[in-house]
A protein has these predicted regions:
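Active-site-adjacent structural elements that line small-molecule/cofactor binding pockets in enzymes
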Residues: 1-135
């Protein structure tokens, strides 16, 4: 059974590098880039090739097709933990994760709408307008 560990502290990064098959982290692409540098150093410190481990990431995703929606959301997000934008902006941001060696990106539904129907509709739009670029 593969072990996935989501962590960022130096000690846990070393333990993850030594024992896990996948490392998970949170953040926007810039934050994940910083964390990836620390994870690579942890792998090297325990004698493990960083490319041997799968990597996954997650961030709060706010699909905001209009500038007004972006402006409303930007005032309330944690910048280094969030992706905010319309379709092309999200495609560009997600492509950066791919460049960083991330194999899988997790999207939590709590940022995609208040009701189940709104979340469903946002997921459908994300799939059609954003995620389809990665298939």
């Amino acid at each position: 059974l593969p072990i996935l560990v989501g962590t960022g502290s130096p000690r846990m990064l070393r333990l993850t590098a030594r024992w896990a098959e996948e490392w998970n982290t949170w953040g926007d692409p810039d934050e994940v880039a910083r964390r990836t540098e620390r994870f690579t150093a942890a792998c090297e410190s325990v004698g493990r090739e960083p490319g041997e481990l799968r990597r996954s990431a997650q961030a709060m995703v706010f699909f905001t097709p209009t500038q007004a929606a972006r402006d409303a959301v930007q005032a309330h997000v944690v910048p280094d933990r969030s992706l905010v934008g319309g379709a092309q902006e999200l495609v560009d941001q997600l492509a950066r994760y791919e460049e960083l060696g991330v194999h899988e990106f997790a999207i939590a539904d709590f940022t995609l709408g208040e009701s189940p129907e709104e979340r469903r509709d946002t997921y459908a739009a994300l799939h059609a307008d954003v995620l389809s670029a990665f298939r």
